[in-house]
Amino acid sequence: MRERVRKMKESLRVSKYPLCVEQFRLANESLEQTAGEPMLLRRAKLHAHVLDNITIFIEEDDLLCGSGASKPFGLEMQYEYGVWTKDEVESLKSEIYTISPENEEELYRLNERFAGNSLNHNLVETMGKSLGEDDRLWPFMKSGLVLPPWKDRKGGSGGGFAMSGYGLGPGFSLVCVDYAKILKGGAKAIIEEAKECLHNLRYYEADSIEKRNYWEGVIIVFEAWVRFANRYADLAEKMAADETRETRKKELLEMAAICRRVPYYPAENFREALQSFWFTFLMVCPSPTSTAGRFDQYM
């Protein structure tokens, strides 16, 4: 086993997983700023605000950029499904999760501001009843794949979820996006298509305004996604400037060059394709049933 692989394997042996509040905080900021706007645009701007501001990092020996949370091995406490109670947080702390005192205090402050403002604050209770009563789904709900894990059917999961990724909340269905479309055309093709649709839109139909909001939202999200990749390019270049080891400096500069290209442009080689795929996957998550699809075919 190569030394790099051995070190990365050892880094996976962690006993505690940090709970992060950055995404919760940024979501709250965005929802306050966009109050009264169409929901399609609110969600798009929320997504962009998170991608533009969430903490990013590149760890030692990384060759691909992108983490699903603001801390290594972290889980972002989700904002979509209601506030987090102290009992829920204490339950997680008693298991394999940890949260800093500062973040825990901030979480409770966000709860007070966020109560009733989440995008799906009534969904947990309504879905929880049906999911908890389904014998086939009960082992899944109890597993903790959606945090916090259900202790019993009566108690359910409570109000919050904590997961990894920058999608707009956890899903309860199988999700498989068209990775090949990004690999072959890049985000550039989707942005250009959205702009063309906006240009050609004629306000003759009842849903014309909704179509405009949708295409504007597509542009907002995909342009933010490209900026997210460029943030990693900036970070890799900064780290390379401070790096004294020539081999690692070269690796960081190569990572920066790749992030300048993908996901905006189509991938031109396998390394770029891997990075483009991973950025795409981060945008799909969190969802307990996200899938990479036919990786063997489109790669």
List PLM regions with ranges:
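Long, non-catalytic protein-protein interaction scaffolds
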Residues: 1-202
